[in-house]
């Protein structure tokens, strides 16, 4: 029997015909051995059976329909796996260049890249149904099913979890105003945003290019020691990214503007089920720094921490719910100001870059001939013409993995590798 779920306004944000936006979310795992394809197919079937939106498809709507729905069949329609031995860089560029088809279940795609030192499993999720944490949750179910291990699914029923107003909305207008006050400074400071200098891009080249970067545990310890008191690793990572942009532009003789900013996706699932429930729970905050303030890593990190701390305390990440599903509660003037913060609405307010951090993850071994899980990678929906680089962070096995995704029309693969190397130097020296 097919279940239906009304699309949330947040889901609808990523159902778009804008050719500048490809709402694909990358999750990738590497194993020490080789996947058995029959066993992997069985694990996929078991994994999607655990999560409603993992086997959903977008329902067909009439021209007069006011509401869109997900259709959740008992079984997924199409669980094909692409198998290739092409270079993984080429596969990534091709595989993530298109978002999965919405009207076919499931709204994600799977590829296995055969390599001599261990297979790679690439998962491409449509952001309308999955955020990064949701994609990671499916990877966990897949690994456990492949290994024959139990997979307890947490969180409330899917209908309750997707009541965004109940999960993250303001309780009253007073709460809205507290959030709006926290968002006011970034909006004011966002004057003349610095854009990443283009290098090597081509309209005829790949839509996306990728540059993976690994920071080993001893190197990460050195970087973390540079944090000012009260700052998080994420604050440090964002500050290093802002500094990298300014240094990159200097080497390209491109003057900085007034501000440099980072689009920071935020998982607003409640703490009790922060890593559970597959759906789109990603809000966005703008971390905006004045260029004249960004002089060194320690100072920039302190400034970022001074911005993120109050935003977390006020629950400001819920602003997107207040705006998109707030109904008539919001005063018209406040609603208009919040609309200007939407990352996909007006080019002049899209940030310099995007950085999304899944935190430390524990993906178990797939077992059998696949062996151990040796690497986990992630990159968000981000890279577009005005915000050409998105970075996904994952802590796994004592290392920090940073996947840089670039808009190939603006920045070439070799150039993105140099940008990633410059980020590494900024973070560690």
Swiss-Prot record:
InterPro entries assigned: CAT-like_dom_sf (IPR023213)
GO CC terms in record: plasma membrane
Gene3D superfamilies on file: Chloramphenicol acetyltransferase-like domain, Nonribosomal peptide synthetase, condensation domain
Protein name: Uncharacterized protein Rv2305
